């Protein structure tokens, strides 16, 4: 049901987007303008030097985000936030903490991609901090085009990255996992399928084998991070910052850099950099989660969810439902029950049940 709704949403939204772009262009430039736009999309759908083509491509992906959230809601899979985390919502506090490792990786990627500290890179420090025009050539776009592209990237790319995370590491992984009764098998299959599908759907972008391995490695480690943190927050940030940096560095359209070359579509060096930085990001997120004592548990079907402090009548963070039904497999509760005047006289009112940790 949810998948059918998403497919329908995607088809209708793409038709609307196509009409919104092609009709005005056809009216102003005639049939040749429409043909040129089609050719531009076919040759470089994510060309950062063409704001029209780039915005069309990004918007066509961004619309998937509200689509998947509505699909989950309409299909009654659960609240829309069920894809966000084990708390059925975006954990904004945890998201803020994840900015630390995200910015560290962004800084490392900036140094690597610009070749900051070696000859022949995009940026030179010889006599000052400036673009190395001898290596990358001159910008081929106007200031107005560059400004438009940067605004589009900053506004749309975070939602584009979030849409892909919610589709692949949220909906697809949870759906596949729910089909398999053996939890460990379901988890492995969910990670494998989501990673393979994520990588294969990037083939139309022109990636070669190394480029697909690059994307696949990114997707695999992102899937593991989602399982380890119980949510999409860390991977959405990682995905967004990674894509923003790529687009920003390419936006000037440097004359000395051929984005259609074989090396631009993937190299073994690029794959190793992505693999290394992704593993480093996972490690930093793991340490941060342990330090912050991140709650990666998920509530059972009967468990109530509260915004803010847990009410006194709920009996504390570990809930005891009627007849012993509540959260699943928690350690026995030793603290006093709600409403007890004397902790020494307090005793559990039911068999303790609680929460299961995420893998």
Regions picked out by a protein language model, each given a short descriptive name:
Residues 17-56, 114-146, 200-210, 251-271:
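Membrane interfacial helix motifs at helix-loop boundaries and amphipathic/re-entrant anchors
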Residues 74-95, 170-185, 189, 306-319:
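Cytoplasmic juxtamembrane regions at transmembrane-helix boundaries
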Residues 4-5, 52-56, 60, 93-101, ...:
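Alpha-helical transmembrane segments of integral membrane proteins
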Residues 56-58, 80-163, 173, 178-181, ...:
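Juxtamembrane helix-loop-helix connectors linking adjacent transmembrane helices
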């Amino acid at each position: 049901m949810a998948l059918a709704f998403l497919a329908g949403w995607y088809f209708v939204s793409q038709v609307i987007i196509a009409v919104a772009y092609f009709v005005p262009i056809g009216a102003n430039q005639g049939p040749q303008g429409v043909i040129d736009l089609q050719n531009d999309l076919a040759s470089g759908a994510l060309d950062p030097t063409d704001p029209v083509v780039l915005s069309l491509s990004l918007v066509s992906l961004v619309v998937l985000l509200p689509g998947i959230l509505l699909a989950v809601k309409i299909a009654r899979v659960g609240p829309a936030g069920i894809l966000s985390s084990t708390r059925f919502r975006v954990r904004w506090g945890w998201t803020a903490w994840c900015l630390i490792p995200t910015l560290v990786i962004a800084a490392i990627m900036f140094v690597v991609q610009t070749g900051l500290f070696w000859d022949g890179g995009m940026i030179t420090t010889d006599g000052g901090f400036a673009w190395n025009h001898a290596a990358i050539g001159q910008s081929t776009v106007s200031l107005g085009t560059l400004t438009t592209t940067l605004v589009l990237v900053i506004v749309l790319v975070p939602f584009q990255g979030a849409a892909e995370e919610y589709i692949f590491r949220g909906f697809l992984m949870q759906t596949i996992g729910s089909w398999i009764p053996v939890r460990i098998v379901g988890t492995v299959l969910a990670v494998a399928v989501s990673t393979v599908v994520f990588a294969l759907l990037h083939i139309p972008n022109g990636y070669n084998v190394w480029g697909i391995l690059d994307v696949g490695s990114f997707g695999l480690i992102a899937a593991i991070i989602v399982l380890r943190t119980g949510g999409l927050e860390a991977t959405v940030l990682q995905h967004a910052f990674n894509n923003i940096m790529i687009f920003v560095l390419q936006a000037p359209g440097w004359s000395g850099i051929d984005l259609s070359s074989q090396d631009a579509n993937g190299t073994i060096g690029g794959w190793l950099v992505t693999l290394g930085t992704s593993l480093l990001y996972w490690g930093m997120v793991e340490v941060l989660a342990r330090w912050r004592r991140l709650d990666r548990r998920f509530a059972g079907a009967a468990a109530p969810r509260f915004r803010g402090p847990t009410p006194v009548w709920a009996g504390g963070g570990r809930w005891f439902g009627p007849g012993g039904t509540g959260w699943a497999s928690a350690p026995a509760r030793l603290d006093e029950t709600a409403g007890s005047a004397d902790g020494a006289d307090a005793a559990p009112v039911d068999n303790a049940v609680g929460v299961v940790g995420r893998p």
